[in-house]
Amino acid sequence: METQTVQRELETLPTTKMAQTNPMPGSMGPWKITIYDQENFQGKRMEFTSSCPNVSERSFDNVRSLKVECGAWIGYEHTSFCGQQFILERGEYPRWDAWSGSNAYHIERLMSFRPICSANHKESKITIFEKENFIGRQWEICDDYPSLQAMGWFNNEVGSMKIQCGAWVCYQYPGYRGYQYILECDHHGGDYKHWREWGTHAQTSQIQSIRRIQQ
């Protein structure tokens, strides 16, 4: 049975909206995010406890600041969960560069977002493979690595990955920089057999740092 979630538009005279969507059927995860249409938590704002595929359907032309109060979320550059991905963990993000951070790409748009249901910082495991389709040398990872090469991985590319537990964010460059790829054990069955499955924005198999997502 689906659980009703509440999305409240918080303006001078607040209104309440009900939604029948749920991040995962039968799930009662503690997710809550507040978005604003201006930087520094100004202007119109709205709370969400479930996915939003298009903020323009909620009368937002863009998300310019946000607060994550519960859970971990993925923000997307475009509607329908497409484009660049941005990991959104608990905290305040007063401007676009707070969530794109050291992305090294100037992207000020955030048009859709959803909760990460499988994030489990204490119990996370991923296996990376040298080649596509889980072929070649492999390495099981259960911790955060700001530089895979410094810890023993032999090159700057990863061909495929299996997520056994939790959710991970992989980065194009060392030090958690560059494109972000959020990989979850409950998506693709946890199997990412080709780098193109990492996201609609994926353009390369280059992965040089990786960390667990905080719930």
Swiss-Prot record:
Membrane-crossing segments per the record: none
The entry's keywords: Acetylation, Eye lens protein, Glutathionylation, Methylation, Repeat
Any one GO MF annotation of this record: identical protein binding
In-chain residues carrying the UniProt-annotated modification N-acetylmethionine: 1
PTM-bearing positions, type S-methylcysteine: 82, 117
Signal peptide extent: none
Notes concerning its domains: Has a two-domain beta-structure, folded into four very similar Greek key motifs.
Subunit note: Homo/heterodimer, or complexes of higher-order. The structure of beta-crystallin oligomers seems to be stabilized through interactions between the N-terminal arms. Interacts with CRYBA1.
Name recorded for this polypeptide: Beta-crystallin A3
Organism: Rattus norvegicus (Rat)
